[in-house]
């Protein structure tokens, strides 16, 4: 077998050669970022020219992927949609079983943005390919010329819903360990792991990956994140997350940085209860936000909001449903892309009245896995009709999602999945482990 550095060069150079031009995820490796308490990204150019400024070129990229023109076209499109179409485009549904016809029918009939695939929806490789193909056809049958959100939790380690079908990668803590051992090599193997993960997922028909985890764990007292976190050190975590975002962008798949503003300090599990995080805003900025700031600098397309009770920010309200938390992300950190909730079927938000509607009104663009997808769709339709949520808010959310899916299709078309993607993924996984341990 070739030495680690030699095999790494083959993986990175080969995959990028096949993928075509460098695009938004490329550039020199980031140095270790400083811990910032202010916004770390520059807003993208406005699509509305002033009296003294020339019009913005529609090919100008936004700070999160799509071009200004793609976003404007998405806004024009959703402005023509019915409330039923709008409501669907802000929901990523859940389904039961492994029959591809079930989620395909949901996407077509409810106009869903897409679905989240879990291990319970997976039988084997052939079934996965049949399912993702059926979902793509369903969106096209619904009149959409952009792909649906077909997402999966494939973080590496034990949160990998395609176990036995896609290549197994180590926990994301390996990325932090690799960077701690050798910063430049660590960032490269992390980026290569994300690149090959994304390419392999695309080969299976997926358009989204619910990764990377940007939570900074506090160690043994953290029952939920643990080894899913890249590090207990905010600076190491920031480097790992930034490298992963570049890799996923290179692969032409939508990544999802999670769980804002950071679940690693919570001492209870949001799958079961609503955890309280008693950190002050200053503590959150210093400990939890650096990886998210790094992701935004690297043009992260989507950020997932956590179900946490931030007692010093929005007490008693899950972060995913708190306008103050969306303001922290958008106004303070400068994020302009798609915001998505954590699963709305989790115990942290169970029992709350109309949780999806609360999240949408607070600032969510995508509502992930509500308990009952059809009922949630109708709730949003009725809320638009009654004015409980403004049509403007739903159009804003839907347009971002449409623009991002348009970007994904464009980048994926430029970067075909190589025939030897599985071999490359296995090599990248081995290299990450070797660099870490």
Which stretches of residues belong to each language-model region?
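Preference for extracellular/luminal or secreted protein segments
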Residues: 2-9, 14-109, 351-437
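Acidic/histidine-rich, surface-exposed loop or edge segments in extracytoplasmic proteins
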Residues: 54-58, 85-90, 110-117, 177, ...
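Second-shell residues forming the walls of enzyme active-site clefts
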Residues: 82, 126-140, 144, 232-390
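Hydrophobic faces of well-ordered beta-strands that scaffold small-molecule active sites
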Residues: 88-95, 113-117, 148-154, 208-212, ...
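Active-site mouth loops of central-metabolism enzymes
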Residues: 89-100, 172-189, 273-286, 345-349
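Solvent-exposed loop/turn segments at secondary-structure junctions
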Residues: 96-99, 121-124, 154-159, 208, ...
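A short aromatic-anchored loop/beta-hairpin motif
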Residues: 112-125, 132
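Glycine-rich, aromatic-flanked loop segments that form ligand/cofactor-binding clefts
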Residues: 136-170, 190-214, 237-261
